[in-house]
């Protein structure tokens, strides 16, 4: 909860706004959600796949996203990077929307989680992806700039701005 709103509900609203905008512009995109419980149990779910039209099924999948367990961001970034590398497009963007610091119950806490996520971001960029991070974590100034780098992240301590901000961030990052 943040500012009397469930963070996940606001994130889902922001995803809906963004996917409607991208679909209206004809920009091919996919949406993935992830959760983890140890390094051997990282789940990345496809909410909307590339080429899949935005319709009632996708909207229901977005609305059905539930809170997961832990936030092993590095593994999720590597998984989605592999999918994006398969895409034939010249411009490929990986936008990471998260509500917290990289963590898990098996030593993926603190410095290790931050360094692994930072390395996954570097690997994605080396593979030709543009990567941009978005978070609503009020403490993100302590680690988010280090993970994503200068000009490649946005921190929203006021969560109510997120739904309008995601489409604006996309326009800014892709111009």
Specify the residue positions occupied by each region the protein language model found.
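Acidic, glycine-rich A-domain
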Residues: 1-175
